[in-house]
A protein has these predicted regions:
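Catalytic "initiation/cleavage/transfer" segments centered on a nucleophilic residue
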Residues: 72-136
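Short secondary-structure junctions
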Residues: 19-28, 69-74
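Short, non-transmembrane amphipathic alpha-helical segments
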Residues: 53-74
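N-terminal presequence-like segments and adjacent domain-start helices
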Residues: 1-13
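Short edge beta-strands and adjacent turn/loop segments
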Residues: 24-41
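A short interface-forming secondary-structure element
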Residues: 44-56
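Short, flexible beta-strand-to-coil junctions
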Residues: 33-38, 47-49, 126-127
Length: 136
């Protein structure tokens, strides 16, 4: 299993990507997870604009935002877009609701959104975009 730790540069690269993406694909929850079985770090980005029908366009936005400022510490292949209905997004949003604030959250080995993780990092809610209002 990969024993690699998440480093500050990866966290910062993810934060910059989230902030660029918010202009075209608002992100309401973002977190790095290291799956206990795969042992790989992935950056999960949850948006109310991501659905089965829009996922392809969403990844296009990720690539476009990444290409604005490529970073050696993050590639688009490490990014997983999810909807707010995904159990992982729901878990992150629940943490934001229970512990509002501007501090990041480090996660130890546990079950997160129904999967076993070795570690995780939840970005502070302060860098997220607000959820879209439903059309009236």
């Amino acid at each position: 299993m990969d024993q690699r730790l998440l480093v500050t540069e990866e966290i910062n690269a993810g934060s910059e990507l989230i902030q660029r993406l918010n202009a075209t694909l608002p992100i309401q929850a973002a977190f790095w997870l290291k799956d206990a079985y795969e042992g790989q770090w992935y950056l999960y980005l949850a948006s109310d604009q991501v659905t089965d029908g829009t996922i392809r366009e969403g990844y296009g936005e990720v690539i476009e935002s990444y290409n604005q400022k490529p970073d050696v510490y993050l590639t688009p292949l490490q990014v997983k877009l999810i909807s707010l209905d995904d159990p992982l997004a729901k878990e992150a949003l629940d943490i934001y609701e229970r512990y509002p604030g501007y501090a990041p959250t480090f996660l130890g080995a546990r079950t997160f959104g129904g999967i076993s993780i070795e570690e995780g990092y939840l970005y502070p809610q302060s860098i997220m975009a607000p959820a879209s209002s439903p059309a009236s």
